[in-house]
Amino acid sequence: MIKFLSALILLLVTTAAQAERIRDLTSVQGVRQNSLIGYGLVVGLDGTGDQTTQTPFTTQTLNNMLSQLGITVPTGTNMQLKNVAAVMVTASLPPFGRQGQTIDVVVSSMGNAKSLRGGTLLMTPLKGVDSQVYALAQGNILVGGAGASAGGSSVQVNQLNGGRITNGAVIERELPSQFGVGNTLNLQLNDEDFSMAQQIADTINRVRGYGSATALDARTIQVRVPSGNSSQVRFLADIQNMQVNVTPQDAKVVINSRTGSVVMNREVTLDSCAVAQGNLSVTVNRQANVSQPDTPFGGGQTVVTPQTQIDLRQSGGSLQSVRSSARLNNVVRALNALGATPMDLMSILQSMQSAGCLRAKLEII
C-alpha cells in the first residue's frame, strides 16, 4: 500500500512539473537576428514579367543598371519588356554572422509580374536600418507555385509572385557584437513569468554559487559571468544545459476572430453551467414592381414601386447542461456536445468567462 501511494505521488509530481533546459526557455539578450532589405531586378522570365508601360520604375532601374555596365539607352526609347520584374529582397542577418557566410533570401514582386518562376535575381545589395550594405544577393529563384492558362481559362496553385533563394546572399559586412564585453549577461524568458524567472535564478545559484544570478523582472535574469569571450561561451553553455522544473502554465484560450479557430491548453477547466445558444437570421428581399396605366392615351405614367420583404427566423435556443470538467479531453467533449460552430463557440466561451464558469484567460487575436 505504501509503495502504491509513493508511486502515485511520484506520478502526480511528474505530471505537474516537467523538466526542461534553460536554453529552451530563454534567449541571450543582444544575441538576435537583424533584418535586411534591398531592391533589385529579376531577369529571364518567360514573358511573365512587369508590363513596363504600367511600371515605369522597372524601366528606370533597368536603364540605371545598363548605364553602370557602359550601355547607353537613347532618350525616349520605349522598351516593351516582358522578361524583367522589379522585386524587393529581404533576408535576416544571423547573430555572429561572418564575412563569406551565406544566408537565405526571399524575393517578392512589387510590380504587375505574373510569375517569377524561372527568373534570376541580379546582384542586389542588402542594407540594414543604418543604410549600410551587409550582404549581396544573387541567384536563381525557386518558386513553389505553378500555373497555366489557355483559351481564357487559367489554373494556379499557390503563389507565383514570390520565391526563395537558398544561400542566395553572401555576408560582406559583420555586425559589431557586444558579446564578451562586461561581467554580466541577461537571459530573457520567452514568456514573462515571475515564478519561472526566480526558479531559473535559484537553479543557477545552486550550481554556480549564491549571487551568480538575479531575477530582475518577470522576463529578465541577470547572470554574472567571467570576462572574455571564450570563458563566457563555456560558462553560458553550462548554464543553458541546466534542467529546470517547469510549473503548469496559466490556463488560456486563444480565439482568432478572423478565422474562427479556438485553441486552448490543457490547464483549461470548466465549472458546471447551463448554455442556451440561439441563431438569429434576417433575410431582406427587395423586388421592383412596374406599374403601367391601363389606357395608353389616358395621360398616366409608368411607375416603378419597390416591394421589400423581411423574413426573421430564430433557431436553436434550447438550454443545455455543461458538466464540470478538469481534463482537456473532457472540456473538448463538453463543448462539442453543444453542437456549436466555431463562430458560435467564441461567443459561448466569452459568456462562460463572464459567468465565471470558464477557468482560463481569454485572448482574442
Swiss-Prot record:
List cystine links.
none
Give the CC-aspect GO terms: bacterial-type flagellum basal body, distal rod, P ring; outer membrane-bounded periplasmic space
Keyword check for Signal: yes
Q: Which domain of life is it from?
A: Bacteria
Q: Which residues form the signal peptide?
A: 1-19
Keyword vocabulary terms for this entry: Bacterial flagellum, Periplasm, Signal
The Swiss-Prot or TrEMBL record describes its family as follows: Belongs to the FlgI family.
Please give the PANTHER family that the UniProt record associates with this protein.
FLAGELLAR P-RING PERIPLASMIC PROTEIN FLGI, FLAGELLAR P-RING PROTEIN
Q: What is this protein called?
A: Flagellar P-ring protein
- Please tell me the species this chain comes from: Shigella boydii serotype 4 (strain Sb227)
Taxonomy-wise, where does this protein's organism fall, top ranks first?
Bacteria, Pseudomonadati, Pseudomonadota, Gammaproteobacteria, Enterobacterales
